[in-house]
Amino acid sequence: MRAAFLVVLAALSTSPASAANLELQAKISLAGGRGRIDHMAFDPVSRRLFVAELGNDSVAVIDVDDHRLERRIADLREPQGIAYYAPLQRLYVTGGGDGTVRAYDARDYRELKRIKLGSDADNIRVDLRAQRLYVGYGDGGVAILQPDSLDLVGDIRLNAHPESFQLSASDGRIYINIPESHSIAIVDTAADNRVSSFDAKWGGNFPMAIDEVSQTLLAVFRKPPRIARYSSKDGHLLRDVETCADADDVFLDAKRRRLYVVCGQGAIDILESVTLKRIERLATSPGARTGLYSSEADLLFIAVPARTGGEAAVWVWSPAP
């Protein structure tokens, strides 16, 4: 009897979908795509989703309303980071394989410009207020670029390769995960990009989100699988809990005060944003560790890489209520 109870309990602990929290709306095929899938960007006007297909050396362009793969941008070298800049209708793609940042016209997908930063060009962020692009790359750099020309206008030096980072609109700071040194760097853009850091306590801190309302920072770790909430003022650890394994993305749903942790073990953890209490754990697919939550579309996109017997896809989830 006890064994049967434990089997039922395990089955209930990771549910495939839930009308109360996230509803699976569609599975959009990425037919022909192979290998690892990295980050995404969304254009809310054209309703196009851009997916960095790292293992396929391409970017997939998806029509979200029609649930279809529209086209691919090919001949890339391990695309990792991706960003959309609405004022210029530009799409930016970073290359882990060649260390480049490429700019495309998002209307016809012509390559407009390219700059080589060095090795392993990775995460990219857009600062609309300052009209700047920030790109993590190499063994410890964040390049500052002009969106129109891709001219290099600054370079922030760190002690190791940067992973996910976030720009604070309230205080002009940049918060950067540095897994190799188990730390989080803070860059003060108002003080000539002065860099400080604090000990993050655990290792493998890849995903990050920022909560401007509560002035807190959320970092997710792989070693061990854990999420921590820090004060963005001084790095003080406020709370930490266990989470799903092999996380590569975390998103704040400000409307519902929730967090979505996307994990390669094949799960999404839905947490309360302040207490970090788990609301639910949903099953996805092994290796599906990257995604994008768009507040404009109010949709959560999860990248599912191809596996034996199945093709790559983007799963589209609708939060509720």
How would you label these PLM feature ranges?
Residues 15-321:
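Predominantly soluble domains enriched in secretory-pathway, periplasmic, or organellar proteins
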Residues 3-14:
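Bacterial N-terminal signal peptides
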